[in-house]
């Protein structure tokens, strides 16, 4: 199984580009696991593969154990933000032993700095402490050394691997609302763009507020994406000049990697889709022929097929005059594409910190290994990534940078900066 995953990462993954040779060699450790399936063996195999994938710097690469508890792979019931010599607990949702502001001084007896000084730093996703993602190491830790914020006392705890999944909870009931902050400012928070009707409903209910506002503060700090349809209702309030939704979002076509492995999987997918949807034999054959003709040709440009209504120019609404967008590394997916679109609008200013930087590689493929595990990887690149101007690991930069400090444990500093602009 690992041989197949390694081959996919080297040849079929849209971000391969020779980077597979730079990944950690976990093969000797995988080989020691043996072939007999046991719960312990599977758990260790997942840990090794997840570490290998984390070192690519692309969170789109994932492996999932089928039939397991559908919690997020790296969930421990809290999140932590890295500083120079420790991790600060910045949110707790399912661990009553911890409080916001507590410090994590060591993981499995090793200081935080030790993880930055060897190959493990590649699994942190970020090049600066405030952008590091410690989820992998927290999830697989046996002990965490904690310093209490309130008392300064220290204790060791075992992470709660059965914690509720904050991401799943957020996806079930994503935060979405709009409210006035003062006579001239409206604040809108969107944590998901998946439900276009819900976004349209909030826009419709607050249309008057938005039109009268001098400034819209649009909070995308926790928005993991969703769909481009979820952006469309916002268009009249975000644009400077008349433009279609397609023009606003920019080129949404993709460079798809037609490797042999990808083409084999695409043909199998077409045959399955044909069977389920009742395609004619001619329709199926035409699509299979198209794929086979492109096999092993490398990256092939495929333009986006936009709905007709996305090509019709839209007039900007009378308000707001300015749009201030709140951003942090929790912003990902379609929300990052929205950020890039807003960078092209003169009325928009991005405040905070860079987004996650995980949207260069798209069009996810799923490989089923013996109905036991699923491996997920992207097979296409955005035009920007293909031209060497991607945002992977870097994110969309803020116009007004707000560095993370301990003050954010007590106050929403990014929002304060936005309101003062």
Where are these regions (language model features)?
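Flexible, low-complexity junctional segments that flank or bridge functional domains
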Residues: 1-216, 220-251, 258-266, 322, ...
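Conserved acidic, small-residue-rich alpha-beta core segments centered on
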Residues: 228-409
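Juxtamembrane/interface motifs at transmembrane-helix termini
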Residues: 67, 397, 411-413
């Amino acid at each position: 199984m690992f041989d197949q995953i390694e081959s996919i990462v080297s040849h079929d993954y849209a971000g391969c580009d020779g980077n597979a040779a730079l990944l950690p060699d976990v093969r000797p450790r995988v080989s020691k696991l043996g072939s007999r399936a046991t719960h312990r063996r599977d758990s260790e195999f997942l840990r090794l593969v997840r570490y290998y994938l984390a070192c690519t710097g692309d969170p789109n690469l994932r492996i999932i154990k089928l039939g397991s508890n559908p919690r997020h792979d790296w969930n421990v019931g809290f999140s932590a933000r890295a500083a120079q010599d420790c991790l600060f607990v910045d949110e707790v949702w399912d661990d009553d032993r911890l409080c916001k502001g507590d410090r994590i001084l060591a993981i499995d007896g090793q200081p935080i700095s030790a993880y930055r000084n060897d190959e493990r730093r590649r699994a942190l996703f970020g090049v600066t402490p405030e952008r590091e993602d410690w989820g992998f190491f927290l999830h697989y830790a046996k002990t965490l050394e904690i310093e209490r914020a309130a008392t300064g006392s220290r204790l060791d705890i075992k992470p709660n691997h059965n914690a509720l999944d904050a991401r799943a909870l957020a996806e079930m009931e994503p935060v979405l609302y709009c409210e006035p902050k003062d006579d001239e400012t409206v604040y809108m928070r969107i944590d998901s763009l998946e439900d276009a009707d819900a976004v349209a409903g909030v826009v419709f209910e607050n249309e008057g507020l938005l039109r009268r506002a001098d400034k819209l503060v649009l909070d995308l700090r926790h928005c993991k994406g969703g769909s481009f349809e979820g952006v469309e209702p916002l268009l009249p309030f975000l644009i400077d000049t008349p433009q279609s939704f397609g023009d606003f979002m920019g080129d949404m076509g993709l460079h798809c990697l037609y490797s042999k492995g990808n083409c084999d999987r695409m043909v199998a997918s077409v045959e399955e889709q044909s069977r389920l949807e009742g395609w004619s034999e001619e329709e199926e054959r035409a699509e299979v022929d198209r794929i086979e003709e492109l096999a092993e040709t490398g990256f092939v440009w495929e333009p986006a097929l936009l709905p007709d209504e996305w090509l019709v120019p839209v007039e900007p609404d009378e308000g707001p005059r300015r749009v201030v967008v709140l951003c942090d590394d929790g912003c990902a997916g379609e929300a990052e594409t929205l950020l890039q679109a807003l960078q092209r609008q003169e009325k928009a200013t991005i405040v905070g910190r860079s987004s996650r930087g995980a949207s260069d590689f798209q069009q996810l493929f799923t490989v089923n290994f013996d109905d036991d595990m699923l491996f997920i990887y992207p097979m296409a690149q955005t035009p920007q990534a293909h031209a060497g101007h991607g945002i992977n690991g870097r994110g969309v930069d803020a116009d007004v940078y707000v560095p993370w400090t301990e003050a954010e444990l007590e106050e929403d500093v990014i929002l304060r900066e936005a309101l003062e602009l």
